[in-house]
Amino acid sequence: MAVEPLRVLVTGAAGQIGYALVPMIARGIMLGANQPVILHMLDIPPAAEALNGVKMELVDAAFPLLKGVVATTDAAEACKGVNVAVMVGGFPRKEGMERKDVMSKNVSIYKAQASALEQHAAPNCKVLVVANPANTNALILKEFAPSIPEKNISCLTRLDHNRALGQISERLNVQVSDVKNVIIWGNHSSTQYPDVNHATVKTQGVDKPVRELVADDAWLNGEFITTVQQRGAAIIKARKLSSALSAASSACDHIHDWVLGTPEGTWVSMGVYSDGSYNVPAGIIYSFPVTCKNGEWTIVQGLPIDDDSRKKMDATAAELVEEKTLAYSCLT
């Protein structure tokens, strides 16, 4: 029995992240080695020629799983029948720009894309927002696509989650696949809280707490947190371009685990619509630890939160509430 292809939308597809992401999707890294895909690529009219170049390369790569490519500058055409939407397109902050100006540009982009998805996407479409400010862009999308269930709209904090795993694995000189259950709480910004209080490392077949193995609270409570929070800026400084390869890879991880499930005993971080869990204000998109099964995520409940964690979780929530207010002020 042939597997029906899934339609995957990538917006901003001619950009850096898009260029890294589309071959990963076409190779089956996002949805699995047996799942055929039809790629829908959207970008703005000035990027139309570059977008066509990406389409040519996708044809040239002869990916067995790639059953078709739609490359367009028309949002309605791009969204038609898509099962998964990865929203990479947005308005980047340029030097000298006020936060409100950037927010205003992104609010109008995400309002328009929300209505295109609302009208044209497949009924159970899963949406992942990557473009910054990711949490608030996802919130705007949710507001203006009321027929898409709120549980189907998420934002990317898996990049931060993976960055945290990477830092622990480097510090302890262990395989990154043996580190699990870090948490990114809050905003995909420098206020995010990378929490290792529940994280473990597998050593000689046994899961041991990261805190115990690292045995350096000063590092875990200080440099580790700031390194993860500021990793994006460090990569821009080194590469003169933003992190594209790691962003694309973590977007694949996010969708892969959401659709195909997380391993037993492992959670991941996803920016999802808050229901008030862990006393986080409802009505914002906030990164929580989640497990996934049968295409649905569930917030991991009942983790003990110490006073220091509480303060950091509240600070990043406050920033998200403030961003929400700013975004809504751009709507009037």
From Swiss-Prot:
NAD(+) binds at residues 16-17, 43, 90, 113, 132. One of its GO terms (biological process) is malate metabolic process. The active site is at 188 (proton acceptor). Transmembrane segments: none annotated. It catalyses: (S)-malate + NAD(+) = oxaloacetate + NADH + H(+). Its main location: cytoplasm. PROSITE patterns: MDH. It holds the Pfam family Ldh_1_N. Keywords: Cytoplasm, NAD, Oxidoreductase, Tricarboxylic acid cycle. Its EC number is 1.1.1.37. It is found in: Cytoplasm. The keyword NAD applies. SUPFAM superfamilies: LDH C-terminal domain-like, NAD(P)-binding Rossmann-fold domains. It is an enzyme of class 1 (oxidoreductase). One of its GO terms (molecular function) is L-malate dehydrogenase (NAD+) activity. InterPro entries: L-lactate/malate_DH (IPR001557), Lactate/malate_DH_C (IPR022383), Lactate/malate_DH_N (IPR001236), Lactate_DH/Glyco_Ohase_4_C (IPR015955), Malate_DH_AS (IPR001252), Malate_DH_NAD-dep_euk (IPR011274), Malate_DH_type2 (IPR010945), NAD(P)-bd_dom_sf (IPR036291). The keyword Cytoplasm applies. Coiled coil: none annotated. GO terms for cellular component: cytoplasm. Oxaloacetate binds at residues 99, 132, 163, 188, 243. NCBIfam families: MalateDH-SF1, MDH_euk_cyt, PRK05442.1. Homodimer. Belongs to the LDH/MDH superfamily. MDH type 2 family. This is Malate dehydrogenase, cytoplasmic. It comes from Mesembryanthemum crystallinum. The gene is MDH.
